Amino acid sequence: MLLLPLPLLLFFLCSRAEAGEIIGGTECKPHSRPYMAYLEIVTSNGPSKSCGGFLIRRNFVLTAVHCAGRSITVTLGAHNITEKEDTWQKLEVIKQFRHPKYNTSTLHHDIMLLKLKEKASLTLAVGTLPFPSQFNFVPPGRMCRVAGWGRTGVLKPGSDTLQEVKLRLMDPQACSHFRYFDHNLQLCVGNPRKTKSAFKGDSGGPLLCAGVAQGIVSYGRLDAKPPAVFTRISHYRPWINKILQAN
């Protein structure tokens, strides 16, 4: 199987494409996911792309490192990204903390912290999301949710409105076709018997399990068939804490 680096995933999402779409999901109730962040990214080559992310502190957003770029603007409080509302807060990213061990071949350590130029104002439409402790190892079989503005089908454009889908955490064996899948660093998400998945455009968004962000959308198959691979947040809690404490 051909696996593509995550930057391409944002345009292909899942064989190894960056996961960026919600396939088989439904539209979220407006502003029911106040932690969601929409990232507009200018790449080093000039073209722009988009990713998801989520607010963990008033001045920090957590996302995937394959969403890094020359510059990033974060929109909080959005539901329809084409219709500006009073709830919107557009904030500039002043520093991108990319995980130092990120590997574009294995796609391990696909996690990044974004420091915002200004602190977000917490409102009914903008809020923070809890993330797990280092030793919180979420078990297979758990039903979780992922949200994003990504494609709703392999050949379809990105969604204007925030979409959400329920996905099951799978045993590591379900992701054995991904050559570099590592259960200690990553989560295998999505029942292969179902059509529901995250796809291009959802990259960087959170996997929410019992109210806690356990994973970050990373990559999957080019045809968007589940399961997909998510970064396991609990493994990176010490790294996250170190950056938050120093900034």
UniProtKB/Swiss-Prot annotation:
It comes from the Eukaryota. It comes from Macaca fascicularis. Its EC number is 3.4.21.39. Glycans are attached at residues 80, 103. Residues 1-19 form the signal peptide. One of its GO terms (molecular function) is serine-type endopeptidase activity. GO terms for cellular component: cytoplasm; extracellular space; intracellular membrane-bounded organelle. Gene3D superfamilies: Trypsin-like serine proteases (2.40.10.10). Keywords: Disulfide bond, Glycoprotein, Hydrolase, Protease, Secreted, Serine protease, Signal, Zymogen. Residues 20-21 form a propeptide. Disulfide bonds join 51-67, 144-209, 175-188. This is Chymase. GO terms for biological process: proteolysis. Coiled coil: none annotated. The keyword Metal-binding does not apply. InterPro entries: Peptidase_S1_PA, Peptidase_S1_PA_chymotrypsin, Peptidase_S1A, Trypsin_dom, TRYPSIN_SER. It is found in: Secreted; Cytoplasmic granule. It catalyses: Preferential cleavage: Phe-|-Xaa > Tyr-|-Xaa > Trp-|-Xaa > Leu-|-Xaa. It holds the Pfam family Trypsin. Major secreted protease of mast cells with suspected roles in vasoactive peptide generation, extracellular matrix degradation, and regulation of gland secretion. Residues 22-245 form the Peptidase S1 domain. The active site is at 66 (charge relay system), 110 (charge relay system), 203 (charge relay system). Belongs to the peptidase S1 family. Granzyme subfamily.
